[in-house]
Design a protein with these regions (language model features):
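Universal eukaryotic N-terminal targeting presequences
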Residues: 1-2, 298
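Alpha-helical substrate-recognition element adjacent to the catalytic core
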Residues: 2-161, 166-175
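C-terminal cap/substrate-recognition subdomain and adjoining C-terminal extension
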Residues: 119-144, 148-298
């Protein structure tokens, strides 16, 4: 009879969470380079796309009511994040129409990811490889939910930075088809906003739960941006905001809507919270919250 406790489920964002910085520009320049070998120079087209998005986002941000400083609850912030859907989907559609990712195969994406890590164009946060090892050792489960353009690029980064422990991991993210059109997880609608990430997290957890007789002892979500707000604050979820210095846009949002996140290393037995922050995965491993360093989970 198996008397082991139910596993912990970790769900991770990718850009700025697993990686130190956003990788969208790195991916875009890879697409530009691939198309250039076929005689198509899309560099200027990409910068137009980039500028168009920036202008649209600025108009939406400054025109939305209630203004940022006046949004004081999770519900108000979630409503704002969901209001960005048409803007984000419009941007994804323009990327699809540009053909920047046309005819880039899965193997090319993975090789590029490996090369980008080796060159230092992409860097993962401190302790990520050890985090994967400890999660697997603890028989916990983990997966990735991301609005990134390429799930295969994510898989390449995971394989190159965490080895065999990451090869069979569920990655729910967008991906381009052969014509360069961006599709969402399982070839569904593009995933671009916080509500879509929440739905993806629930889908991932349901798949994992169906293979477990005991369910999960804890569900932990780790993210770094506004698109993570619904996952971080979902009922029954322990949220960890990733921040290099305990500052930044997401931390500001969480402080504004409350409760403010506490550092994962400051947790003491008998005191509980559902919202934390960490600088990197090394701090998450050492935290007494999850027992990943061989200590007792609290």
């Amino acid at each position: 009879m198996d008397t082991s406790p139910p596993p912990i489920a970790f769900v991770l964002d990718f850009d700025g969470t697993i990686t130190q910085e956003d990788t969208i520009s790195t991916i875009a320049h890879f697409g530009i380079a691939c198309q250039k070998t076929r005689g198509n120079d899309l560099e200027n087209a990409w910068y137009i796309l980039y500028d168009t998005y920036g202008e649209s986002f600025s108009r939406s941000f400054h025109g939305y009511k209630p203004a940022e400083a006046d949004r004081k609850t999770v519900a108000e912030e979630v409503t704002y994040q969901r209001a960005l859907k048409s803007l984000e989907l419009g941007s994804f559609n323009r990327v699809s129409q540009s053909g920047i990712f046309k005819e880039i195969g899965d193997d090319q994406w993975r090789k590029f990811a490996k090369d980008a890590l080796e060159k230092g164009d992409v860097n993962v946060r401190k302790g990520f490889g050890d985090f994967v090892k400890q999660v697997n050792k603890a028989k916990a489960t983990w997966g990735v939910v991301s609005v990134n353009f390429s799930s295969q690029f994510i898989r390449g980064v995971l394989a190159a930075s965490a080895g065999a422990g990451a090869t069979e991991i569920e990655v729910l993210a967008n991906h381009p088809d052969e014509e360069g059109k961006l599709l969402g997880p399982n070839d569904g609608p593009v995933m671009a906003t916080s509500d879509a990430k929440l739905a993806a997290m629930k889908d991932l957890l349901q798949k994992r739960k169906s293979g477990s007789k005991t369910g999960f002892s804890k569900v932990v979500y780790i993210g770094d941006s506004g698109t993570d707000i619904e996952c971080l604050t979902a009922e029954g979820v322990i949220g960890i905001a990733m921040s290099t210095d305990g500052k930044g846009r997401l931390i500001d949002i969480l402080n504004r809507i409350g409760p403010s996140p506490v550092h994962v290393g400051s947790q003491q037995e008998g005191k509980s919270s559902s919202l934390y922050w960490a600088r990197n995965f090394e701090e998450i491993i050492k935290s007494p919250l999850f027992g990943l360093e061989g200590g007792r989970e609290i």
